[in-house]
Amino acid sequence: MSVTDPEALLLLPRLSIQNANAISSPLTWGFPSPGAFTGFVHALQRRVGISLDIELDGVGIVCHRFEAQISQPAGKRTKVFNLTRNPLNRDGSTAAIVEEGRAHLEVSLLLGVHGDGLDDHPAQEIARQVQEQAGAMRLAGGSILPWCNERFPAPNAELLMLGGSDEQRRKNQRRLTRRLLPGFALVSREALLQQHLETLRTTLPEATTLDALLDLCRINFEPPATSSEEEASPPDAAWQVRDKPGWLVPIPAGYNALSPLYLPGEVRNARDRETPLRFVENLFGLGEWLSPHRVAALSDLLWYHHAEPDKGLYRWSTPRFVEHAIA
Protein backbone atom coordinates (compact mmCIF):
# COMPACT_ATOMS: atom_id res chain seq x y z
CA MET A 1 0.00 0.00 0.00
CA SER A 2 1.50 3.34 -1.08
CA VAL A 3 0.50 6.61 0.57
CA THR A 4 1.45 10.22 -0.05
CA ASP A 5 3.94 11.64 2.42
CA PRO A 6 2.38 14.54 4.34
CA GLU A 7 3.94 17.97 4.01
CA ALA A 8 2.73 18.95 7.48
CA LEU A 9 1.07 17.53 10.58
CA LEU A 10 -1.91 19.25 12.20
CA LEU A 11 -2.60 18.50 15.86
CA LEU A 12 -6.16 18.71 17.21
CA PRO A 13 -5.46 18.39 20.94
CA ARG A 14 -7.61 17.07 23.77
CA LEU A 15 -10.99 16.58 22.09
CA SER A 16 -13.59 15.58 24.69
CA ILE A 17 -16.13 13.21 23.09
CA GLN A 18 -19.42 12.47 24.85
CA ASN A 19 -21.46 9.34 24.11
CA ALA A 20 -19.26 7.94 21.35
CA ASN A 21 -20.17 4.56 19.92
CA ALA A 22 -18.51 1.83 22.01
CA ILE A 23 -19.66 -1.15 19.89
CA SER A 24 -17.11 -1.07 17.10
CA SER A 25 -18.04 -4.39 15.44
CA PRO A 26 -20.15 -7.54 16.00
CA LEU A 27 -17.30 -9.09 18.04
CA THR A 28 -15.56 -6.17 19.77
CA TRP A 29 -16.54 -3.34 22.08
CA GLY A 30 -14.69 -0.52 23.78
CA PHE A 31 -12.70 2.14 21.96
CA PRO A 32 -14.30 3.26 18.66
CA SER A 33 -13.11 1.73 15.41
CA PRO A 34 -10.22 3.43 13.56
CA GLY A 35 -12.64 3.73 10.65
CA ALA A 36 -14.68 6.22 12.68
CA PHE A 37 -11.65 8.52 12.87
CA THR A 38 -10.63 8.18 9.21
CA GLY A 39 -14.25 8.90 8.28
CA PHE A 40 -14.20 11.97 10.54
CA VAL A 41 -11.11 13.30 8.76
CA HIS A 42 -12.72 12.64 5.37
CA ALA A 43 -15.80 14.66 6.40
CA LEU A 44 -13.56 17.40 7.82
CA GLN A 45 -11.64 17.53 4.54
CA ARG A 46 -14.88 18.17 2.65
CA ARG A 47 -15.59 21.14 4.93
CA VAL A 48 -12.24 22.92 4.87
CA GLY A 49 -10.41 21.53 1.85
CA ILE A 50 -11.86 23.87 -0.79
CA SER A 51 -11.65 27.13 1.17
CA LEU A 52 -8.10 26.48 2.40
CA ASP A 53 -6.84 24.57 -0.67
CA ILE A 54 -5.39 21.79 1.49
CA GLU A 55 -5.96 18.05 1.67
CA LEU A 56 -6.31 16.19 4.95
CA ASP A 57 -5.13 12.62 4.53
CA GLY A 58 -4.41 10.21 7.37
CA VAL A 59 -5.09 10.48 11.09
CA GLY A 60 -3.10 9.52 14.17
CA ILE A 61 -5.22 8.49 17.17
CA VAL A 62 -3.95 9.18 20.69
CA CYS A 63 -6.23 8.40 23.64
CA HIS A 64 -5.82 10.25 26.95
CA ARG A 65 -8.97 9.06 28.73
CA PHE A 66 -11.59 6.39 28.09
CA GLU A 67 -14.70 5.90 30.21
CA ALA A 68 -17.11 3.21 29.02
CA GLN A 69 -20.70 3.77 30.15
CA ILE A 70 -21.11 0.41 31.86
CA SER A 71 -22.10 -0.95 35.25
CA GLN A 72 -22.00 -4.28 37.08
CA PRO A 73 -25.34 -5.44 38.48
CA ALA A 74 -25.36 -6.73 42.05
CA GLY A 75 -24.55 -10.43 42.22
CA LYS A 76 -23.40 -10.58 38.58
CA ARG A 77 -19.90 -11.22 37.24
CA THR A 78 -20.54 -9.61 33.88
CA LYS A 79 -20.93 -5.91 33.10
CA VAL A 80 -23.71 -4.30 31.11
CA PHE A 81 -24.06 -1.05 29.18
CA ASN A 82 -25.87 1.85 30.80
CA LEU A 83 -28.99 2.38 28.69
CA THR A 84 -31.17 5.47 28.37
CA ARG A 85 -34.76 5.59 29.57
CA ASN A 86 -36.77 7.22 26.78
CA PRO A 87 -39.90 9.37 27.31
CA LEU A 88 -43.29 7.66 27.47
CA ASN A 89 -45.30 7.08 24.33
CA ARG A 90 -48.38 9.15 23.54
CA ASP A 91 -50.68 6.60 25.16
CA GLY A 92 -48.60 6.59 28.35
CA SER A 93 -46.97 3.21 27.71
CA THR A 94 -43.27 2.62 28.32
CA ALA A 95 -41.07 3.31 25.31
CA ALA A 96 -38.89 0.50 24.01
CA ILE A 97 -35.29 0.43 25.18
CA VAL A 98 -32.82 0.44 22.30
CA GLU A 99 -29.62 -1.25 23.46
CA GLU A 100 -26.54 0.76 22.54
CA GLY A 101 -23.00 1.02 23.84
CA ARG A 102 -21.66 4.46 24.69
CA ALA A 103 -18.38 5.84 26.03
CA HIS A 104 -16.85 9.18 26.97
CA LEU A 105 -13.28 9.71 25.81
CA GLU A 106 -10.59 12.32 25.40
CA VAL A 107 -8.39 12.04 22.31
CA SER A 108 -5.83 14.02 20.36
CA LEU A 109 -5.83 13.66 16.58
CA LEU A 110 -2.80 14.09 14.34
CA LEU A 111 -3.80 14.89 10.75
CA GLY A 112 -1.59 14.56 7.69
CA VAL A 113 -1.79 17.70 5.52
CA HIS A 114 -0.55 18.58 2.04
CA GLY A 115 -1.56 21.03 -0.67
CA ASP A 116 -0.80 24.45 -2.12
CA GLY A 117 -2.74 26.16 0.66
CA LEU A 118 0.11 25.50 3.08
CA ASP A 119 2.07 28.22 1.25
CA ASP A 120 -0.89 30.56 0.75
CA HIS A 121 -2.21 30.75 4.32
CA PRO A 122 -0.51 31.32 7.69
CA ALA A 123 -0.07 28.14 9.71
CA GLN A 124 -2.02 29.57 12.66
CA GLU A 125 -4.97 30.47 10.43
CA ILE A 126 -5.14 26.97 8.93
CA ALA A 127 -4.99 25.37 12.38
CA ARG A 128 -7.65 27.73 13.76
CA GLN A 129 -10.13 27.12 10.93
CA VAL A 130 -9.71 23.34 11.03
CA GLN A 131 -10.14 23.28 14.81
CA GLU A 132 -13.22 25.49 14.55
CA GLN A 133 -14.87 23.23 11.96
CA ALA A 134 -13.94 20.05 13.86
CA GLY A 135 -15.62 21.34 17.02
CA ALA A 136 -18.96 21.56 15.18
CA MET A 137 -18.88 17.93 14.00
CA ARG A 138 -19.61 14.55 15.53
CA LEU A 139 -16.93 11.93 16.02
CA ALA A 140 -17.72 8.20 16.25
CA GLY A 141 -21.36 9.15 16.81
CA GLY A 142 -20.48 11.29 19.84
CA SER A 143 -20.57 15.02 20.46
CA ILE A 144 -17.36 17.05 20.68
CA LEU A 145 -17.68 19.16 23.83
CA PRO A 146 -16.17 22.63 24.28
CA TRP A 147 -13.22 23.02 26.64
CA CYS A 148 -14.58 23.47 30.17
CA ASN A 149 -11.51 23.30 32.43
CA GLU A 150 -11.38 26.71 34.13
CA ARG A 151 -7.94 26.05 35.64
CA PHE A 152 -6.19 25.78 32.27
CA PRO A 153 -6.70 27.63 28.97
CA ALA A 154 -8.11 25.71 26.02
CA PRO A 155 -5.31 24.05 24.01
CA ASN A 156 -4.91 25.41 20.49
CA ALA A 157 -4.46 23.37 17.34
CA GLU A 158 -0.97 23.43 15.86
CA LEU A 159 0.28 23.02 12.30
CA LEU A 160 3.82 21.63 12.07
CA MET A 161 5.62 21.80 8.73
CA LEU A 162 7.82 18.76 8.08
CA GLY A 163 10.47 20.58 6.05
CA GLY A 164 13.78 21.98 7.26
CA SER A 165 16.95 20.30 8.50
CA ASP A 166 17.00 16.93 10.24
CA GLU A 167 17.85 18.57 13.55
CA GLN A 168 14.96 21.03 13.24
CA ARG A 169 12.52 18.22 12.38
CA ARG A 170 13.63 16.18 15.40
CA LYS A 171 13.27 19.23 17.65
CA ASN A 172 9.77 19.99 16.37
CA GLN A 173 8.71 16.36 16.70
CA ARG A 174 9.89 16.16 20.31
CA ARG A 175 7.91 19.29 21.12
CA LEU A 176 4.77 17.96 19.43
CA THR A 177 5.19 14.55 21.07
CA ARG A 178 5.17 16.15 24.51
CA ARG A 179 1.72 17.55 23.75
CA LEU A 180 0.49 13.98 23.16
CA LEU A 181 1.61 12.78 26.60
CA PRO A 182 0.34 11.21 28.73
CA GLY A 183 -1.52 9.11 26.21
CA PHE A 184 -1.40 5.99 24.07
CA ALA A 185 -1.49 5.82 20.27
CA LEU A 186 -3.29 3.05 18.40
CA VAL A 187 -1.38 1.37 15.56
CA SER A 188 -1.89 -1.67 13.36
CA ARG A 189 0.25 -4.78 13.98
CA GLU A 190 -0.54 -6.93 10.94
CA ALA A 191 3.07 -8.13 10.62
CA LEU A 192 3.12 -9.31 14.24
CA LEU A 193 -0.14 -11.21 13.70
CA GLN A 194 1.28 -13.00 10.65
CA GLN A 195 4.50 -13.78 12.52
CA HIS A 196 2.57 -15.27 15.44
CA LEU A 197 0.48 -17.37 13.04
CA GLU A 198 3.64 -18.93 11.61
CA THR A 199 4.91 -19.64 15.14
CA LEU A 200 1.57 -21.18 16.11
CA ARG A 201 1.56 -23.46 13.07
CA THR A 202 4.82 -25.09 14.16
CA THR A 203 2.86 -26.84 16.93
CA LEU A 204 -0.66 -26.60 15.48
CA PRO A 205 -0.51 -26.92 11.66
CA GLU A 206 -4.25 -26.32 11.19
CA ALA A 207 -4.19 -22.98 13.07
CA THR A 208 -5.93 -20.06 11.35
CA THR A 209 -5.41 -16.31 11.52
CA LEU A 210 -8.35 -16.11 13.93
CA ASP A 211 -6.59 -18.59 16.24
CA ALA A 212 -3.48 -16.39 16.19
CA LEU A 213 -5.53 -13.26 16.88
CA LEU A 214 -7.31 -14.83 19.86
CA ASP A 215 -4.08 -16.29 21.22
CA LEU A 216 -2.43 -12.86 21.19
CA CYS A 217 -5.36 -10.94 22.70
CA ARG A 218 -6.58 -13.25 25.46
CA ILE A 219 -4.99 -13.95 28.85
CA ASN A 220 -3.09 -17.26 28.61
CA PHE A 221 -2.21 -19.17 31.79
CA GLU A 222 0.58 -21.72 31.43
CA PRO A 223 2.90 -23.67 33.76
CA PRO A 224 6.41 -22.27 34.28
CA ALA A 225 9.42 -24.04 32.78
CA THR A 226 10.93 -26.69 35.08
CA SER A 227 14.38 -28.23 35.33
CA SER A 228 15.14 -31.97 35.24
CA GLU A 229 15.51 -32.05 39.07
CA GLU A 230 12.09 -30.44 39.53
CA GLU A 231 10.55 -32.94 37.12
CA ALA A 232 11.87 -35.82 39.26
CA SER A 233 10.23 -34.36 42.38
CA PRO A 234 7.47 -32.07 41.09
CA PRO A 235 6.63 -29.11 43.37
CA ASP A 236 3.17 -27.74 44.00
CA ALA A 237 1.20 -26.76 40.93
CA ALA A 238 2.04 -23.27 39.65
CA TRP A 239 0.62 -21.24 36.81
CA GLN A 240 1.70 -17.93 35.34
CA VAL A 241 0.33 -15.51 32.77
CA ARG A 242 2.15 -15.59 29.44
CA ASP A 243 3.89 -12.29 28.68
CA LYS A 244 2.74 -10.34 25.62
CA PRO A 245 4.99 -8.30 23.31
CA GLY A 246 2.87 -5.20 23.99
CA TRP A 247 -0.60 -3.89 24.79
CA LEU A 248 -2.32 -5.86 22.02
CA VAL A 249 -6.04 -5.61 21.22
CA PRO A 250 -8.36 -6.96 18.52
CA ILE A 251 -9.65 -4.19 16.25
CA PRO A 252 -11.95 -3.88 13.24
CA ALA A 253 -9.65 -3.66 10.22
CA GLY A 254 -12.16 -2.87 7.47
CA TYR A 255 -14.83 -4.59 5.41
CA ASN A 256 -15.05 -7.50 2.98
CA ALA A 257 -17.67 -7.60 0.23
CA LEU A 258 -20.57 -10.06 0.47
CA SER A 259 -22.27 -8.94 -2.74
CA PRO A 260 -21.41 -7.36 -6.06
CA LEU A 261 -21.36 -3.58 -6.37
CA TYR A 262 -24.90 -2.44 -7.19
CA LEU A 263 -25.56 0.67 -9.26
CA PRO A 264 -27.18 3.72 -7.62
CA GLY A 265 -30.91 3.15 -7.13
CA GLU A 266 -30.68 -0.57 -7.95
CA VAL A 267 -31.29 -1.67 -4.35
CA ARG A 268 -34.76 -0.80 -3.10
CA ASN A 269 -35.13 1.28 0.09
CA ALA A 270 -31.43 2.23 0.18
CA ARG A 271 -30.69 5.34 2.23
CA ASP A 272 -28.70 6.99 -0.56
CA ARG A 273 -29.98 6.50 -4.12
CA GLU A 274 -27.07 8.39 -5.73
CA THR A 275 -24.18 6.22 -4.49
CA PRO A 276 -23.28 2.62 -5.48
CA LEU A 277 -24.14 0.09 -2.77
CA ARG A 278 -22.50 -3.13 -1.62
CA PHE A 279 -23.24 -5.47 1.30
CA VAL A 280 -20.17 -6.16 3.45
CA GLU A 281 -18.98 -7.86 6.63
CA ASN A 282 -16.34 -6.84 9.14
CA LEU A 283 -12.66 -7.71 8.87
CA PHE A 284 -10.64 -8.03 12.07
CA GLY A 285 -6.99 -7.38 12.77
CA LEU A 286 -4.48 -6.79 15.53
CA GLY A 287 -3.78 -3.39 17.05
CA GLU A 288 -1.42 -2.13 19.72
CA TRP A 289 -1.55 0.79 22.13
CA LEU A 290 1.86 2.36 22.61
CA SER A 291 3.32 5.63 23.84
CA PRO A 292 3.88 8.19 21.04
CA HIS A 293 7.50 8.71 22.11
CA ARG A 294 8.35 5.16 20.97
CA VAL A 295 7.90 5.81 17.25
CA ALA A 296 10.68 7.11 15.02
CA ALA A 297 8.40 9.66 13.31
CA LEU A 298 4.92 10.87 14.25
CA SER A 299 3.78 10.28 10.66
CA ASP A 300 4.15 6.55 11.40
CA LEU A 301 1.00 6.83 13.55
CA LEU A 302 -1.27 7.90 10.68
CA TRP A 303 -4.18 5.63 9.70
CA TYR A 304 -5.23 5.52 6.02
CA HIS A 305 -8.15 4.10 4.08
CA HIS A 306 -7.27 1.65 1.32
CA ALA A 307 -9.94 0.36 -1.08
CA GLU A 308 -9.67 -2.49 -3.59
CA PRO A 309 -13.18 -2.64 -5.11
CA ASP A 310 -12.22 -5.36 -7.60
CA LYS A 311 -11.27 -7.65 -4.69
CA GLY A 312 -14.09 -6.43 -2.47
CA LEU A 313 -11.69 -5.18 0.22
CA TYR A 314 -12.05 -1.89 2.09
CA ARG A 315 -9.43 -1.60 4.81
CA TRP A 316 -7.62 0.85 7.06
CA SER A 317 -4.15 0.49 8.55
CA THR A 318 -0.99 2.35 9.57
CA PRO A 319 1.27 1.45 6.61
CA ARG A 320 4.24 3.56 7.71
CA PHE A 321 4.30 1.95 11.14
CA VAL A 322 4.19 -1.49 9.51
CA GLU A 323 7.36 -0.57 7.62
CA HIS A 324 9.16 0.74 10.73
CA ALA A 325 7.50 -1.48 13.34
CA ILE A 326 9.02 -1.65 16.80
CA ALA A 327 10.10 -5.19 17.67
Curated annotation (Swiss-Prot):
Phenotype caused by lack of the gene: Mutants lose phage DMS3 infection-dependent inhibition of biofilm formation while there is normal biofilm formation in the absence of phage infection. Loss of production of crRNA in the presence or absence of phage. Disruption of the entire Y.pestis-subtype CRISPR region disrupts crRNA production but does not alter phage resistance (possibly OLNs PA14_33350 to PA14_33310, and the flanking CRISPR loci), indicating this CRISPR is not involved in phage resistance.
Spell out where the chain crosses the membrane. none
Query: Would you kindly state one Gene Ontology biological process term found in this protein's UniProt entry?
Result: defense response to virus
Among InterPro entries, the record links this protein to:
CRISPR-assoc_prot_Csy2
Q: Which UniProt keywords apply?
A: Antiviral defense
Q: Is Hydrolase set as a keyword in this record? A: no
Q: What does this protein do?
A: CRISPR (clustered regularly interspaced short palindromic repeat) is an adaptive immune system that provides protection against mobile genetic elements (viruses, transposable elements and conjugative plasmids). CRISPR clusters contain sequences complementary to antecedent mobile elements and target invading nucleic acids. CRISPR clusters are transcribed and processed into CRISPR RNA (crRNA). Cas3 and Cascade participate in CRISPR interference, the third stage of CRISPR immunity (Potential). Absolutely required for crRNA production or stability.
Task: Summarize subunit and interaction data from the UniProt record for this chain.
Answer: Interacts directly with Csy1; part of the Csy ribonucleoprotein complex with a probable stoichiometry of Csy1(1),Csy2(1),Csy3(6),Cas6/Csy4(1)-crRNA(1). A Csy3(6),Cas6/Csy4(1)-crRNA(1) subcomplex is also formed.
Other remarks on this protein: In this bacteria, Y.pestis-subtype CRISPRs do not confer resistance to phage DMS3 or MP22, but instead are required for DMS3 infection-dependent inhibition of biofilm formation and possibly motility.
Name the chain's protein.
CRISPR-associated protein Csy2
Organism from which the protein derives = Pseudomonas aeruginosa (strain UCBPP-PA14)
